[in-house]
Amino acid sequence: MSARQAGFTSEAPPPRSARAALVVLAAVLGLAACASHERATKKKDDASTYNTQLGIAYLRQGDVPLAKEKLDRALRENPGNPEVHSARAMLFDRMGEPAKADAEYRAALRLAPQDPDVSNNYAVYLCQIGRTDEGVHRFEAVARNALYRTPWVAYSNAGVCLRSAKRNAEAARNFKQALLTRPNFAEAAYQLGDLEFQGGNLTDARAQVDTYIGAFEATPDLLLLGVRVARAQGDRLAVEHYARKLRLDFPSSAQTHALAELDHN
């Protein structure tokens, strides 16, 4: 008895060309679904990045509640974004919640262990809360990271961290390392010169100022430092030289205003 005679329906398999078309259609549908998923994921990632940037902007403006709202949303949109966690760490630091801030920095590091910017941000935080050795260690690791394009900044940051802890000899070594790496890095030159000045080493401080501005473009900080050092040395001609250049080159700077206050003292 045939299948049709027994009451069952039976269809012949589609021809080979039809089967091939079905396979192609299935593949196309699979690719379309994958592409759709990728687009949705990218949309969420883009939204997370956008809200992170907004959150940071609001935080800089001092609007902590709105910053938190944006960063909470960014986290929901992409919990695997290390930039979100770094931003939330800054938020919690501002809110006076150090445990949460530290946890967020560590989350960012777990997600991006080789990202020097993430490590640099954490190092800044560690120095600010007095964990100097940890902060300096991270700054120096960042400086050695081949992915970090400005190692002189990391060395200088390590110096600032050490200086804030009154570890001046170690700070000076880091400022010098920054200048070896980038001789025209004005911030390190200023920090080293000011460190010498505060330590009473007027000759070394003056040499630091003159060496830098003799080779590179002067900055307001270095010129004002030159004024202060020359005044301490009793060198009136040098005082007038630095002061004139500061007034002419940077008339609206905060350092020029500070110079006016010095003149009244």
Give residue spans per PLM region:
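Bacterial Sec signal peptide processing site at the extreme N-terminus
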Residues: 28-50
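Terminal, low-structured helical/coil segments at or just beyond the last alpha-helical repeat
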Residues: 39, 214-265
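Structural marker of alpha-solenoid helical repeat scaffolds
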Residues: 43, 77, 111-112, 145-147, ...
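Canonical tetratricopeptide repeat
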Residues: 53, 87, 121, 155-157, ...
